[in-house]
Amino acid sequence: MVSVIIPNYCHAPYLRQRIDSVLAQSYPDFEVVLLDDCSTDGSREVIERYRNHPRIKQIVYNDRNGGSAFAQWRKGFALTQGEYIWIAESDDYADPAFLERCMAELDADPACVLAHTLSRTVDSEGRPFGKVRHAGRPVRRMDGRRFVLRHLLRRNE
């Protein structure tokens, strides 16, 4: 099972599209946790429309703002039970086959533990703008150690 965490803070204009795009996924085995970090823009009203949806495992409203997206992620991790976690940011949306394609790659190689994808920037009408770097690249496997050393660790010189 995949646990989908949707952390939200004041993204009411995009939130319905995000939640709908998650719930429309063709992959059959997932749960959704909706987290709201004290939004003041009507996000709660959008979220409440989904309260009784069978895929929604839990909805959590913070009493005060956590101050960090990472705090929301940690809260979501504690509430989920899936083998994999998808952090589906509230101002994005996904193609209906997104999760199915990611899981096919992860399932094809038991050594894979992380899927990373490219994204496309769109305007408020859904029209793409800007470039998608490396669009059309084939799926590839990376050695995690080399990735960490090259991209995440920096020497303090």
Model regions and ranges:
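Nucleotide-sugar donor-binding/catalytic module of glycosyltransferases
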Residues: 1-157
